[in-house]
Amino acid sequence: MRSDVIKKGIERAPHRSLFKAMGFTDEELERPLIGVANSFNELIPGHIHLRKIAEAVKAGIRMAGGTPLEFNTIGICDGIAMNHLGMKYSLPSRELIADSVELVARVYHFDGIVVIASCDKIIPGMLMAIARLNIPAIFVSGGPMLPGRFKGEYVDVKTVFEAVGAVKAGKMSYEELKLLENFACPGCGSCAGMFTANTMNALTEALGISLPWNGTAPAPYAHRIRIAKETGMQIVKLVEKDVKARDILTREAFEDAIAVDMALGGSTNTVLHLMAIANEAKVDLSLEDFDRISEKTPTLAKLSPAGKHFVVDLYEAGGILGVMKRLSELGLIHEDRLTVSLKTVGELLKSAFVSRDDVIRPVTNPYHPRGGIMILRGTLAPNGAVIKVSAVEGVEVFEGPAKVFDSEEEATAAILSGKIERGDVVVIRYEGPKGGPGMREMLTPTSAIAGMGLDKDVALVTDGRFSGATRGLSVGHVSPEAAEGGPIALVKDGDIIRIDLKNKRIDLLVDEEELRKRREEWKPKVKELTGYLKRYSTLVTSANTGAILRH
């Protein structure tokens, strides 16, 4: 066993003595040592209940003859971090989480590991770690939150974000907003829609690195505890057969995950995260792969923020395997690849079902013939940009004058004070991975635009990124970013920007000679940075490569 390095032989008597100081018996030390990386904290609704999940995982490990060793890592709630300095630290936390899990796992030579997380950057951080470690590993989440009910309607945190704009526009009273706060998020779990957290949870199941139903079983349901126990039991089987993370995280697995992502109309953040995880798994994944798979994958679901359904509806309709079953009809799923269940995808699909065609549409009646995420290129984004087309309605071409802001705060203030008009293209720059630094999510400005009823008439373009809760004509991940001298740094108020979804282009309609003059005059904005952000900004790469760190 890998763990023999720290527990076998006469030289390891001191090591065993230290284990015994924690109450471990000789018999426990003879068994496989299974790391349990928990991200429980009292800071995130999706993580507040993870102690219970970890206890179930550990029970399963013991039942199967292993010895669990639990440790913790950090986690940040993107919703609470939104629209202030805190959001600069969200994406950078992904790398810290991966590094912290790697550090502990390397020191203790775990025979296998179970990683537990529910929310935005913690999930990819955990997956990056297990891909890097390449030992037997399974991911398990705490599950999605249930939607709330307010005045007879289902609501979620997106409803509250958009209500802020509605209050500013005089469409809702502040007293009604205060009431809504109490009902939108009814309990534990990752926010109820197909936002970043739940998209990533869904993709762990599509990748095959979690057990069936992990992607959708709601946080309050007993099914979630059963999945956690089964995960604990299954990791011991993976150790016995020495099935490692990269045996699961193959190129075919990533292609299937992208197909599921496109069918669900998932968060644009998945583009960053899947590329970062693939990088650790030694799989070459690029924006071209997302574009290629999106072109042939129909959008089969419209969950919040794009539609009226929530993740609990997807669970009841057949879950992620139900989506994969539908996609397999088009030959879009690699059915012969292995999953952590030790069954192939094809074997799992034999028991898959779809019980609600209104939630998971048939491939003959999709919401859209192509996938929910589109890669744009053009003179404004030579290296690519990303848009969630599943959250855009009735717009194929949008052309308008730019209103340029060098920070999210400036843009939000302008939107809420009524300075943005129908037909405008709001440009928010110097918010990229390096320039932010940290590539903040622009949920507050996009929600304000939507809440004021302008989401079909105003576009937003940024080198930052978006929450999975964002809807409307929102183009993010513009690359190269402003801090690296990308064309977005040269945009001026009044410049015409054209977004053409039919031809997958985003162009700055300014002649080359004028841009050449502007480039000669351009000077990068210098921000005074300290601590982790200073180190991060010097090491982080572009959004079009997953915003990973240079090694």
Curated annotation (Swiss-Prot):
GO terms for molecular function: 2 iron, 2 sulfur cluster binding; dihydroxy-acid dehydratase activity; magnesium ion binding. [2Fe-2S] cluster binds at C119, C191. It catalyses: (2R)-2,3-dihydroxy-3-methylbutanoate = 3-methyl-2-oxobutanoate + H2O; (2R,3R)-2,3-dihydroxy-3-methylpentanoate = (S)-3-methyl-2-oxopentanoate + H2O. Its EC number is 4.2.1.9. The modification N6-carboxylysine is found at K121. The keyword Iron-sulfur applies. One of its GO terms (cellular component) is cytosol. SUPFAM superfamilies: IlvD/EDD N-terminal domain-like, LeuD/IlvD-like. Its cofactor is [2Fe-2S] cluster; Mg(2+). Mg(2+) binds at D78, D120, K121, E441. The keyword Lyase applies. Binds 1 [2Fe-2S] cluster per subunit. This cluster acts as a Lewis acid cofactor. Pathway: Amino-acid biosynthesis; L-isoleucine biosynthesis; L-isoleucine from 2-oxobutanoate: step 3/4; Amino-acid biosynthesis; L-valine biosynthesis; L-valine from pyruvate: step 3/4. Keywords: 2Fe-2S, Amino-acid biosynthesis, Branched-chain amino acid biosynthesis, Iron, Iron-sulfur, Lyase, Magnesium, Metal-binding. GO terms for biological process: isoleucine biosynthetic process; L-valine biosynthetic process. Belongs to the IlvD/Edd family. Functions in the biosynthesis of branched-chain amino acids. Catalyzes the dehydration of (2R,3R)-2,3-dihydroxy-3-methylpentanoate (2,3-dihydroxy-3-methylvalerate) into 2-oxo-3-methylpentanoate (2-oxo-3-methylvalerate) and of (2R)-2,3-dihydroxy-3-methylbutanoate (2,3-dihydroxyisovalerate) into 2-oxo-3-methylbutanoate (2-oxoisovalerate), the penultimate precursor to L-isoleucine and L-valine, respectively. This is Dihydroxy-acid dehydratase. The lineage of its organism: Archaea, Methanobacteriati, Methanobacteriota, Thermococci, Thermococcales.
